Regions:
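A binding-site-centric feature that preferentially detects glycan-recognition modules on secreted/surface proteins
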Residues: 1-226, 232-306
């Protein structure tokens, strides 16, 4: 057996790096059979100290986030805040999920404990997180459902901000035009929603600075209970417009798990300030003019399934 065959596929640089990592003395002891080697897989941390996804190894475009665009985490003390979000959901969608504030709080605390125990992903809770209930899915067509959810967004947003307006630039254009992106895991959420209400944690901006193609690319290396956001972002906006659309300085939100007419196009929410009327507003539209670029105020979101 030739020496050339034994190191086939290795460059000199890779071999030198291996010896450097081992240490020359240790490498020689291994070579002489003087020591045994045990291997332990290194668990990579997937989120930084701010709760942002570490974009290592992605091919799609990513840029640094502009932290002037941010969400404020409100203190979720007791059941009152949970109850307010649930009430907005029930009132605007005219549904009853059957999940109480006490039940949601208990489920969210359980999910947070799971995240804290996993060193790879524990940092995500350093960012903003929101308790969400996805209602039971009634319609077969996702475009029909999205139209209904966006109507609820308008009601909730203008109820919280009576002097503002919500502009849905795709109103009446979504039926039979919306699908789930492959490998986004959003189909797991949809499957659960067809069975009944689904509680979970919505993380609005762990992907700030990612293009929506990068949003989609990164999901495959996260633990299975993480889902790339789509419909859950809309429901989170229904429940918490005061956080997600506070003013111009809140990040714009990609619905990267959903495609509009083709996989090259998706959706986003954008909080804007209209200088003409001197008022903030919330817009919903498609991403046709954004791809494939990364913007420092845009973010995809993640949903952690309960």
């Amino acid at each position: 057996m030739s020496e050339r065959w034994m190191i086939q596929g290795w460059t000199n640089g890779e071999l030198n790096a291996l010896v450097k990592n081992l240490g020359e003395e240790t490498a020689r002891k291994i070579q002489r059979g003087e020591v045994k080697v045990s291997l332990e897989e290194v668990m990579k941390v997937l989120f930084d100290k701010h709760g942002r996804r570490i974009p290592e190894g992605l091919r799609a475009n990513v840029c640094d986030p502009n932290r002037d665009f941010r969400f404020d985490q409100l203190e979720l003390i007791g059941k009152a805040y949970y109850a307010n979000g649930i009430k907005r959901l029930h009132d605007t969608l005219e549904v009853d999920t059957g999940i109480s504030a006490k039940q949601l709080k208990r489920e969210i605390e359980h999910l947070l404990a799971i995240l804290r125990e996993n060193s790879q992903v524990a940092n995500i809770i350093n960012g903003v997180w929101l308790p969400v209930i996805m209602p039971k899915l009634e319609a077969d067509d996702l475009g029909t459902t999205l139209e209904q959810y966006l109507e609820a967004v308008g009601k909730s947003y203008t109820d919280v901000f009576p002097d503002r307006k919500f502009n849905n630039y795709l109103k009446g254009k979504l039926v039979d035009q919306v699908s789930i992106v492959d490998n986004s895991r959003h189909d797991q959420l949809i499957k659960r929603m067809r069975q009944g209400p689904v509680p979970g944690i919505h993380f609005p901006n762990p992907l700030q600075g990612f293009s929506f193609q990068a949003d989609r690319e990164q999901i495959v290396t996260l633990p299975e209970r993480f889902v790339l956001s789509g419909l859950d972002t809309v429901i989170a906006m229904v429940m918490y417009p005061d956080i997600l659309a506070r003013n111009y300085w809140t990040p714009d939100l990609d619905l990267a798990a959903l495609s509009y007419q083709s996989t090259a196009d998706s959706f986003y929410f954008e909080a804007l300030y209209d200088v003409v009327v001197d008022e903030d507003e919330l817009n919903f539209g498609d991403t046709a003019n954004l791809a494939p670029h990364a913007y420092n105020e845009f973010s995809g979101s993640l949903f952690f399934l309960g």
